[in-house]
Every structure is written in C-alpha cells, then in structure tokens.
Amino acid sequence: GDSTPIDTQRDILRTTFDLGINHFDLANNYGPPYGSAETNFGRLLKEDFRPYRDELLISTKAGWDMWPGPYGSGGGSRKYVLASLDQSLQRMGLDYVDIFYSHRFDAHTPLEETAGALASAVRQGKALYIGIS
C-alpha cells in the first residue's frame, strides 16, 4: 500500500527475490488505499524486475468491495470478477497473472458463475491458473 515508502517496498522485494522468494501474492483490495499494493508492485516490476518476469509467480485476487455501483461491491459475479482482473492487470502493467483467485465465497452468486468467469480469464490469456481462496 501507500503507507510504506516506495524505497522500503523496493528493498523488501529485492531482498526477498535475492533470497529465492519468487511468488508475489497480491489482491485488488490490498492497500491502503485499495489497489495501491498492485500499483506499487507494478511500478517496481517495471523499474526493477521486468527482466525477471519469467522467474516470478505473480498472483492476485478479487472479491471485496472496490468501486461504487452495483458491480463494484465485490462478490463473485462474472461482471465483477472479469472487470476486477482487468483493473488489476492495468494497475500492475501486466498482460497476465500466473494465478488469479476468487478471494471469497459470494452467497448471492452461483459458484458455477464465478468458476465460469475464472475459466474465461484463462481462455482469454489473462491468467495461467485459477483458484478460490
């Protein structure tokens, strides 16, 4: 998020990568404010880690409130899941993530709809793997 200086975030990412950690797990609502963890990670990826993209496993999640209106209130609807992924990819400056998760169960959306949206993300080349956390 924005509460930690970007240079500190850079030092943390460099140190973890140098120690062999290559899985960076994010979510659309990580911050504060929401989305800032992905934005900052994307900035550092571009500035420091772009040559190492194929060595990284980058995951993100969607499922919590993110924007006003009927489809931004989180959950597992196809509209929300796919819009959230597009927004996450834009914030990180990526074409795809390695793993895209539905962050939480949504009692108002059939699991089949959420699973179908996740499968669409793979078919569209926006995620290599999917999961439910």
Segment roles from a protein language model:
Residues A37-F41, D54, I58, S77, ...:
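Generic hydrophobic, aliphatic-rich segments that mediate packing or membrane embedding
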Residues L26-N28, L56, T60-A62, Y101-R104, ...:
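A cross-domain feature marking catalytic cores of carbohydrate-active enzymes
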Residues D65-S133:
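Glycine/proline-rich, positively charged
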Residues N28, P32, T39, T60, ...:
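Generic detector of intrinsically disordered, low-complexity, polar/charged segments
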Residues G1-L57, D95, R123:
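N-terminal binding-site loop/beta-alpha segment at the start of enzyme catalytic domains
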